[in-house]
Structure formats: structure tokens, C-alpha cells
């Protein structure tokens, strides 16, 4: 294992051993531990779910519009033609195209954060499954990224919409903002995401649903969160 930096070790020492923090308390501590960082690190949440993602009826996947955004301007590509392509461009899509865009991605280019497509384009976009799928970039009707209303999809993503999907190890990851955010705004974002994760609990999932949760900034130590928390209490 790589040796941790002095700053990492100093931050980790501020986390109380054996304690499970309330979500709002955890994000406030994550923000505190990031003080002095040369960059503005992303604040992330990681969860372990009591589901078996190998079973279709236990897959957890969803989207949520973070009330305070992500602090990041997402780069969005849109696969569309004609009026829909024009609408995507007007909405602020970073890259809009058809066969040319598909060829570019087939060539190895993936410098974007989200992809949207009109339904008629999915026959072609499907060829990109092996490239976009593993990166969680494949347009999908369930996440609102296969749609005729491409302008709304672009606006939602640019406005702070995130999507999440449990991986093969039953882990779930999502961002809730930047360390520069006010602690209350981070907590509000966490609360919105947690509410959606809980809403999506599969009926086939038995026992404890969220078995582990941590909050951390990029490259920072994980702060254990009470896995039994079902809401994030914020202070005005």
C-alpha cells in the first residue's frame, strides 16, 4: 500500500475512532479537513448496499437533482440531428453530433461527463456500449438521458443532476459538491441523494439496506457515517 501523505495522516487523526457520524456532522468535518487544500476538492459519498447486483430485481440505479448543484460544470454530449440538435446546442450542450461524434468516441475520445441521445439515435449509439457502459456514460431512458426533450436533459445535467448505479461489489458512489460549499448546502445535497437512494430500495432486498457509508473529499480520509440514518438534519 502506498504511504499516506503527512496531510492525509493529520486529517485522519481528527476522525474519532469507532464513531459513526450523523450525515450533516460528517460533511461539516469533511469540509474542515479540506481546509488549506491547494485545490477545491470534491466531496463524495460512498455506500455499501445490502443488495445482490447480479440479480436484476436488486439493481439500484437512479438520478437526483442536487438542490445546490455539484460545483462542477458538466461537459455534455448529445447525439441528435435536425431540430433536436439545434435545441441541444441552444441549451448549452458542449458537443452535438451524429455519425461524426460516434466515430470520435470510437477513436477513444471520452472527455465528457454525460451523454444524451434522442431515441432514434440509440441504434447507432448502442455501438458505443463497450466504451460508454463501463464509464457509466451510456444514455439510458431510466436516467432521462434517452429523450426527445434534449434541452431539458442538458439543463438538468448542467444544473446539478447526478446519476448513480450500484457496482458489482454492491458499492454506490456519488458526489454532493465541493469543499468550498457551505456545510448546510453540502448537507442538503446529501439529504436529497439519500432520500432517492432509500426510495429505490428493491423489494427483493432483505435485511439492512445501507450497510456502510462514508463521506470524504478527493484523496481525503473516509469519515464513517451512521448507516441507519434515513434523513439529513440541517440547521438554517
Curated annotation (Swiss-Prot):
InterPro entries to which the protein is assigned, alphabetical: Ribosom_uL1_bac-type (IPR005878), Ribosomal_uL1 (IPR002143), Ribosomal_uL1-like (IPR023674), Ribosomal_uL1/biogenesis (IPR028364), Ribosomal_uL1_3-a/b-sand (IPR016095), Ribosomal_uL1_CS (IPR023673)
One Gene Ontology MF term: rRNA binding
Single biological process term from Gene Ontology: regulation of translation
GO cellular component entries: large ribosomal subunit
Keywords: Repressor, Ribonucleoprotein, Ribosomal protein, RNA-binding, rRNA-binding, Translation regulation, tRNA-binding
PROSITE patterns per UniProt: RIBOSOMAL_L1
Self-association and partners: Part of the 50S ribosomal subunit.
Annotated function: Binds directly to 23S rRNA. The L1 stalk is quite mobile in the ribosome, and is involved in E site tRNA release.
Family per similarity comment: Belongs to the universal ribosomal protein uL1 family.
Protein name (Swiss-Prot/TrEMBL): Large ribosomal subunit protein uL1
Species lineage: Bacteria, Bacillati, Actinomycetota, Actinomycetes, Micrococcales
Amino acid at each position: 500500500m502506498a504511504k499516506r501523505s503527512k496531510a492525509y495522516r493529520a486529517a485522519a487523526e481528527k476522525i474519532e475512532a469507532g464513531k459513526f457520524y450523523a450525515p450533516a456532522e460528517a460533511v461539516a468535518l469533511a469540509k474542515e479537513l479540506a481546509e488549506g487544500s491547494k485545490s477545491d476538492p470534491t466531496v463524495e459519498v460512498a455506500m455499501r448496499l445490502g443488495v445482490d447486483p447480479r440479480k436484476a430485481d436488486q439493481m439500484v440505479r437512479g438520478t437526483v437533482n442536487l438542490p445546490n448543484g455539484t460545483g462542477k460544470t458538466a461537459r455534455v454530449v448529445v447525439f441528435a440531428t435536425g431540430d433536436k440538435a439545434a435545441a441541444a446546442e441552444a441549451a448549452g450542450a458542449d458537443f452535438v453530433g451524429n455519425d461524426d461524434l460516434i466515430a470520435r468516441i470510437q477513436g477513444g475520445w471520452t472527455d465528457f461527463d454525460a451523454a444524451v441521445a434522442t431515441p432514434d439515435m440509440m441504434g447507432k449509439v448502442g455501438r458505443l456500449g463497450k466504451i460508454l457502459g463501463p464509464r457509466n456514460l451510456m444514455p439510458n431512458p431510466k436516467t432521462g438521458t434517452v429523450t426527445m426533450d434534449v434541452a431539458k436533459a442538458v439543463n438538468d445535467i448542467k444544473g446539478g443532476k447526478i446519476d448513480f448505479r450500484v457496482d458489482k461489489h454492491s458499492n454506490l458512489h456519488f458526489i454532493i459538491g465541493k469543499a468550498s460549499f457551505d456545510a448546510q448546502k453540502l448537507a442538503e445535497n446529501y439529504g436529497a441523494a439519500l432520500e432517492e437512494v432509500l426510495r429505490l430500495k428493491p423489494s427483493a432486498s432483505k435485511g439492512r439496506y445501507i450497510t456502510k457509508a462514508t463521506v470524504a473529499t478527493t484523496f481525503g480520509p473516509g469519515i464513517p457515517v451512521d448507516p441507519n440514518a434515513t434523513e439529513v438534519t440541517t440547521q438554517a
